[in-house]
Amino acid sequence: SVILPAGAIYDGQQYGLASLTATALKHGTKNMSKAQLEEELDFIGASVNTYASKESAGLSAKFATKDADKVLNIVKDVLLNPVFDAKEFEKEKQRTLVGLEQAKESPRSVIDDYYSGMLYAGHVYANPVSGRSSTVGKISVDDVKKFYKSFYMPNGAAIAVVGDFKTGDMKAKLTSLFSNWAKGTAPTDVANKPISNPTGAQVLLVNKDDARETTFYIGGPGIKRSNPDFVAVEVINTILGGRFTSW
């Protein structure tokens, strides 16, 4: 897997841009069309997926050990040589818009965005990862190309590989594959901005007359990952309510 600092916090006012950019990586490369890419992976039973989250974007791959060379070359091609085909992008944008409309029918699908929007109002952590219909509809393939050029670089990127291989050989292989990945200007740390803590209790009610279920969140600002108690707090949180089997 490859992870980069290219998540939704860098969307600016173009909510959904990081997500669309990550998805568009698989729309073909300078060496393979989207169809050829999918056929190559299907033939060997491998997969390559892309994603964007709040803070990061990335690419993950699953494949048999014997196919490592082939798939790693595909990973490199997808990450470094995307063409951002305009027709495929428009199709993806329409699918995203349909998905955003469908999500409105399920409270649990949208509550994260409502909650983050209230808790982190005025901060980049309030940015909705999938975007909003009003912003996604205005994003162009040129916007995606610009975002890719600005944020898809080795600065701050990390590559992790788990499987049956010799560490030295794999390290040499990855170094060779990505040695020409050009560095750029590291993005500004837009998240390094104070978050205003609520001065009192806040309640946000979102009514949907035909809803068959009610979903609610209760919470507040947590601690920084750099806090020495972060892991302990995560464990306690998981015990109390972090999983289906929690109390």
Model-derived segments and spans:
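Non-catalytic beta-strand/loop surface segments
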Residues: 1-12, 30-67, 90, 99-156, ...
